[in-house]
Amino acid sequence: MAPNLRKSHPLLKMVNDSLIDLPTPSNISTWWNFGSLLGLCLMTQILTGLLLAMHYTADTTLAFSSVAHTCRNVQYGWLIRNLHANGASFFFICIYLHIGRGFYYGSYLYKETWNTGVILLLTLMATAFVGYVLPWGQMSFWGATVITNLFSAIPYIGQTLVEWAWGGFSVDNPTLTRFFALHFLLPFMIAGLTLIHLTFLHETGSNNPLGVSSNCDKIPFHPYFSTKDLLGFLLMIAPLLTLAMFSPNLLGDPENFTPANPLVTPPHIKPEWYFLFAYAILRSIPNKLGGVLALAASVLILFLAPFLHKSKQRTMTFRPLSQLLFWILVANLLILTWVGSQPVEHPFIIIGQIASLTYFTILLILFPLTSALENKMLNY
């Protein structure tokens, strides 16, 4: 009998072991679709980004015009740009849902997989930030100025660090050039990290909604989950195309239709919607260094998830109190997102401060306490 090429060829063997003959728990739900959706997002973003880079000029005098030229004169340039801009939003929707799933079902107990995932999130955030600066509109320029300026809060080396990042004494041509270089490079770094993420995942196999070992009931990834993923792809591509074609500027800021002007500050400087929760936490502390530390902590706190797990059960499936707390946390994040988009005035200031405090309290104090209480209740 001839050898099966899929199982013997050095390259195809790797593909086979991770996409075809991969033993998968039979009971994983649609919440497990987001990993492959993130892969699809990454491929879409790299493809559209590459096509956009072919028509982009990384120069302060030409960047804004080159983007306008792409939209007006390049075949389907408007569509490529709209897919790329809104694709970023879908990327973040998917990654936030993916993290939420991991948090709910205790997937963070696969420490290496979880930690590489958090590093992936940080890299994605950096990529989105530098990418937002490239069209060189008002919000691009002022967003870059405000966020890079945060590094000056670092004692002793802060100011030097900021000027080194800027390549001068303000956000200018060198900044734009290096941001373009970084925006081109980072997605490939994300692709590399994704392979590491998957390597660690395939060491242990997937978690499942029950949080118990599924070794006794595994099914091949193909055709079962390849088909299920394909449905997921369709369900994500449909709204993405709808948004890109019918309402491409819905999630953008109108300020970015004005070319960057260092002499005019926009009335409300705010990032894209997917950074608003962190921006609200940053603003809720009336001290520069304190705000920066809280901003960093709001994302880096994910690294602590495995250490804050005190429950005897892995998932929240059979833990009603933790479930309640989880959904309060989700609501709290939505409130933070909303507050981040509002001006800095009463009552938004106090709402933001309460929501920020609640965010850290739930994660650091209430989750471990609730888990301990649930453990106690199991003994009765």
UniProtKB/Swiss-Prot annotation:
Keyword Electron transport appears in the UniProt entry: yes
User: A single GO BP annotation from the record?
Assistant: mitochondrial electron transport, ubiquinol to cytochrome c
Which Pfam families did the record assign?
Answer: Cytochrom_B_C (PF00032), Cytochrome_B (PF00033)
- Indicate which residues the UniProt annotation says bind a ubiquinone: 202
The record's comment on cofactor binding reads: Binds 2 heme b groups non-covalently.
PANTHER family tied to this protein: CYTOCHROME B
Q: What else is known?
A: Heme 1 (or BL or b562) is low-potential and absorbs at about 562 nm, and heme 2 (or BH or b566) is high-potential and absorbs at about 566 nm.
Could you tell me what this protein is called? Cytochrome b
Upper classification of the source organism reads: Eukaryota, Metazoa, Chordata, Craniata, Vertebrata
Gene field: MT-CYB
